[in-house]
Amino acid sequence: MEQKESMSRRDALKTMGVIVATAALSSTGLSVFAAPAKKDKNKKRLIFYFTATGNSLYVARELAGESGQLLSIPRLIKDEHLDFEADEIGFVFPDYAASAPLMVREFVSKAHFKAQYIFSVITFGNFAANVADWCDDFCKEKGLQNHYINTLLMVDNYLPVFDMNEQVKIDKKIPDNLAAIVDDIHGHKQFIAHFEQMDERMQGFLKRLQENHFPMEAERLLRLNTETCIACGTCAAVCPHGNFRMTDTHAEFSGSCEYCLACVHACPQKALTLERERNPQARFRNENVSLRDIKEANHQK
């Protein structure tokens, strides 16, 4: 025989309160039974980067967050033992003719990487072209599988084509786009930013540029005004190849050049220039990065 128990008014109100609270929390996506998921801070994340005027360093810092480790490719390239293992490994570098700087290519070719999640973020200033596809193919040739490759539009520091004073005025929505990339990577999103359409002539031009343009000779590219140079050593400190040396009165340079223009942008006297520039008086450095940061990233001691 069933025995029916009557519910007191107090118990009924208590039960109703639990139901209402549960419904309210559910509408916000939270649960009364489980805490929201948190990012695992115990995961080891390595970020390898190449920077000239700070764009890629800024991005690398944002991707590293509080617990990631930043590693400068120019400071590592000469090491004999380049074996790296982590939960997550990332690469951040600028787009050079729809490819990576030569030093980045050399580093990836000679190093060994092991990680559960590998990603690349490529900064560019005007036209990314098929750089993500190039990165995917290049890394696969080296036995490296990217799970995520994306591009980020930023200030273009290429002085022969762009006026830096005009470039910095353009709203390229960098914070919003970068935040979206950071979220993608935290969530281990699988994505390659494929470029579907490109003129065959453009493809051929970029391929010839990649194969024949780099490395360059510093002597052919740079112009030095010895009258305004004060031998301060800034160019020597920011050059990823270590191509500069100081005399008592001025700088001297020679050797293979990445054409990153770090030296030209950083010179406090504007003594270093190129043969052709849109605005010889305008220079650029990412506002979130100091000159000291770039020196620490690139100086060849």
Q: Could you tell me what each predicted segment is?
A:
Residues 1-7, 35:
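N-terminal secretory signal peptides
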Residues 11-34:
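N-terminal export signals
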Residues 28-52, 58-66:
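C-terminal segment of N-terminal export signals and the immediately downstream linker at the start
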Residues 32, 37, 224, 230-258, ...:
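Iron-sulfur cluster-binding cysteine motifs and their immediate structural context
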Residues 67-71, 94-98, 243:
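Short, flexible loop segments at the rims of nucleotide/cofactor-binding pockets, characterized by
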Residues 69-76, 247:
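Short gly/ser/thr-rich secondary-structure transition/capping motifs
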Residues 74-154:
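Helix-loop-strand module that forms the ligand-binding subsite of alpha/beta enzymes
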Residues 132, 148-230, 278-301:
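Ferredoxin-type iron-sulfur electron-transfer modules and their immediate structural context
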